[in-house]
Amino acid sequence: KMVDFFERETEMKFIPTLYPDYHPDVPGGAPIGRSILAQPYDIRGLGKDMPRLKPPLKTITFIGMMFNSSNADLKHFFQFTKSLTSFVYVAKRLVNHIKELALYQRAINVTSGNALAARLAKSALDLGIPILTSTPAKRVLNENGQVVGMQVGGEGGDCDIRASRGVVLACGGFPQDVQRIAKAYPHLQSGGEHLSPTPETNTGDGVRMAETAGADVDLRFK
């Protein structure tokens, strides 16, 4: 129902992937077919707000060009020296990407998380909803056991944003919180190494704010 709603009412479009569930071996888990990604998006659709979209992480691009592992991109790039079809495909992709860099100084056709952010931003902007950047969340506003908004920071100091229908903390987990991941991941407890391509600033602030507001956090990955 959620996917149908977003595709019907917003700019969101999804495509299936070949990814397994995170835990395909548990009851109800599936080895393939359930996961979806945002459909690739041309960010010129954002108009004057296009420069506000943060570029993708360099670690998941090739000279700034994004791939979508659910389509033919990776297959062709792996086979471009073995197949004429793949060679032509890769050549066209590279030429188009170089044009984008020359004209816009960044990739225009984005995939995965960048496409998700761009499509959600386009949907919000079309509805007249302001998108505040450089406005870090400070704490969840809690009155009489009810979440009523967020306190945020900014150039003019802290201010409160009130919410009548709830608050969504979409903060990307806690991949750079050394103490928390040490408790959460069994491979670290057994002496293994943990590497993440996420920004170093992604230290779990959202999780801590939720806990402070009284939320239950389950760190079991089993």
At which residue positions do the language-model features occur?
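Conserved redox-cofactor binding core of oxidoreductases
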Residues: 2-157
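Glycine-rich loop(s) and the adjacent beta-strand/alpha-helix scaffold that form part
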Residues: 107-114, 126, 154-222
